[in-house]
Amino acid sequence: MDLKKPENKGALTSKIAELANNISTFLKNILGSDQHKAALLYYWLRNYLRYIKQEETFNPKYFPQFKPGDIVKVDFGFGIGSGIGSEFGGLHYAIVLAPSNSKNSTVTVVPLRSLKLGKESPKTLYKSDVYLGTELFTVLLDRSGEMLDKCGTFIKEVENTDPKTITVKDIARFEKQLEEAKNLLARHDIIMKEVSRLNAGTVAIVSQIRTVSKIRIQNPRYSKDALYNMRVDRQATDKIRAVMKDLYNIK
């Protein structure tokens, strides 16, 4: 039966209800034995539904233009399987591998993960994994430092202004700087929470390179986002491309 045909609308309605019930039953059944998996499935289904709804109004021109080396945070969905060769899933950092302008609705990325201390070392990684050292940690830490420095500059300017000579124009400028400082501190807090998880080093999973819809990018979406214009150096992307060539026999 072709459920896409108009005459089968009633049957499709019944199948949708059946599927919804099956999903609910399945999630409740695994909740007791594997809450982590149940939660991941729930997030995936919830987010996928949201992405489908967003497709109707999605316009890539409102996203930043991505360049090779840009750091992004991507929802890779629910990973199927376990062990080597299984599909990578969840919300993770990734590095952009190819330019993607405002007309392109997709972007090609390589997902990243943290090195598992005590379980692996850079020398024991699989050939499809690239150890990037503390590159991501350093980039994020440097950016957070820049944000604090800028906030400090705003504060000094206010402190060095003579209250007797302050103008309406000065007050308007200070209010604008205060709002920017609040945004910078919020972004700084987000970055610092991430930095604490990355000091062991970062691994690029070359076998999981994929092209994803920009709808899946959680950060950065706007110029004010924490990861906006944040990029690893050329050496990191060169390492990844070298492994790509070896892994896929690219001349």
What is each residue range found by the language model?
Residues G89-P99:
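Short beta-strand-centered aromatic/proline hotspots
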Residues P99-S105, K116, T211:
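Short, conserved beta-turn/loop elements at beta-strand boundaries and strand-helix junctions
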